[in-house]
């Protein structure tokens, strides 16, 4: 169907909303948003990070393609590392913009990263779903899942949360 320039301008400006817009929650790769959401859930349940024996990260195949670093040399690489981000979150690190400007990986983050493995599990109904399974030294198993990251069209911010996000961005905060 051909459209004239006049027809294109008829409803110009009526609705500037972008359909299915995602709002980025964290100051690192958006491909890690779901795994970060799950890690923050687990941090609430974890009493002592020293009790962690093993952590398994489950992704849909290729859903982690942008998360190219499994081991990092410096925090700037950690922006693209599921292992780094999960370790830092579980250790209670503040992952703001300044964190990723550090020259070296903090030893406790690097140590915890060695206990983390990525696995792949096809989830045809939701390719964004991620799961973290954490085994503790006492035999307990903790698990958290994120079906859709906060800020996605399926789990959108409220108006108040959007205003807070804007205020943080203006103040250069994470």
Segments from the language model and where they lie:
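Terminal-appendage/accessory-domain detector
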Residues: 1-174
């Amino acid at each position: 169907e051909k459209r004239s320039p006049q027809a294109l301008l008829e409803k110009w400006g009526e609705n500037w909303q972008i359909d299915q817009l995602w709002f980025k929650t964290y100051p690192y790769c958006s491909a890690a948003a779901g795994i970060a959401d799950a890690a923050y859930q687990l941090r609430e349940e974890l009493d002592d990070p020293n009790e962690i024996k093993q952590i398994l990260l489950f992704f849909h195949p290729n859903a982690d393609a942008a998360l190219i670093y499994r081991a990092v040399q410096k925090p700037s690489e950690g922006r693209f590392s599921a292992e780094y981000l999960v370790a830092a979150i579980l250790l209670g690190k503040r992952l703001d913009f300044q964190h990723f400007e550090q020259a070296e990986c903090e030893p406790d983050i690097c140590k915890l990263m060695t206990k983390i493995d990525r696995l792949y599990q096809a989830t045809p109904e939701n390719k964004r779903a991620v799961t973290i399974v954490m085994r503790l030294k006492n035999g307990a198993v903790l698990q958290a899942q994120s079906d859709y990251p906060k800020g996605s069209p399926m789990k959108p911010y409220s108006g108040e949360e959007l205003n807070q996000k804007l205020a943080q961005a203006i103040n250069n905060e994470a």
